[in-house]
């Protein structure tokens, strides 16, 4: 008896905290300051949703370390698997198709994911976001 193939199964298992290289916002004509292009993208969607969904919620990363003091910008230390020091811009979350996730880079440790979760919640609340360095 042959094994039935579940149409929802993916060829690889995507987990919350995984960082992949892939395209982000390629189809849109975006303004300055909005992340787009081929870059590190961090999966922030829950593992339960990742098992069945054909798309995932992600946070774009950048190697341009500008506005590092913002509460929604999380700068990572040098992590094996990422080519450069990376900052994730949690206020710019988006959705990508799992087929667009190209190269697996690494999985972030729980302490960094707590910071990412907090920054995403700050961005979602729409509260006035202050700079950690200047307080403005």
Positions of predicted regions on the chain:
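Short, charged beta-turn/beta-strand-edge "cap" motif at the junction between a beta-strand
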Residues: 25-29
């Amino acid at each position: 008896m042959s094994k039935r193939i579940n149409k929802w199964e993916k060829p690889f298992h995507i987990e919350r905290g995984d960082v992949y290289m892939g395209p982000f916002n390629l189809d849109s004509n975006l303004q300055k300051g909005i992340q787009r292009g081929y870059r590190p993208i961090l999966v922030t969607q829950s593992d339960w949703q990742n098992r069945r969904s054909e798309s995932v919620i992600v946070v774009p990363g950048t190697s341009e370390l500008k506005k590092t003091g913002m509460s929604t910008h999380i700068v990572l230390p040098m992590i094996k698997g990422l080519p450069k020091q990376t900052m994730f811009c949690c206020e710019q979350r988006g959705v990508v198709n799992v087929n667009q996730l190209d190269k697996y880079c690494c999985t972030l440790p729980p302490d960094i994911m707590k910071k990412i979760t907090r920054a995403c919640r700050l961005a979602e609340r729409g509260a006035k976001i202050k700079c950690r360095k200047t307080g403005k």
